[in-house]
């Protein structure tokens, strides 16, 4: 896991806030929200592969949404009761970066919607 000082140098203030302070970018503001290219979405902090473009869908929420992740063992899931809501937070298992949340209202085949901050991801085009 990278130390906080190194991450502050590497990341933009928004990327740091989202990944290290469990922040949330404004809806429809992220550069990956409407990305339609084929490729892999990686953790911006440690470069691990998290999501594939084949599982991305338009949810209308304003954040990149995926119905599945590449490897459930690569993501940590924990209950988040902040903001007077009960949600499931998702973070990168390798480095602990906050990614977003997962909700049980996605499309088939999983019925899940991983609602992920663009600021926590980088995209590698195929």
Per-region residue spans from a language model:
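A short Gly-Trp-Pro
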Residues: 1-126
């Amino acid at each position: 896991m990278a130390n906080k000082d190194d991450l502050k140098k590497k990341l933009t203030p928004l990327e740091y806030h989202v990944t290290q302070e469990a922040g949330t970018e404004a809806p429809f503001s992220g550069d990956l929200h409407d990305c339609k290219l084929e490729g892999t979405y990686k953790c911006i902090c440690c470069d691990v592969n998290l999501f594939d473009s084949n599982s991305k869908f338009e949810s209308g929420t304003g954040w990149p949404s995926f119905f599945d992740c590449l490897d459930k063992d690569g993501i940590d899931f924990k209950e988040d009761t902040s903001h007077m809501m009960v949600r499931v937070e998702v973070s990168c298992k390798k480095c602990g970066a906050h990614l977003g949340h997962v909700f049980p209202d996605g499309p088939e085949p999983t019925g899940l919607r991983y609602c992920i901050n663009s600021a926590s991801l980088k995209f590698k085009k195929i």
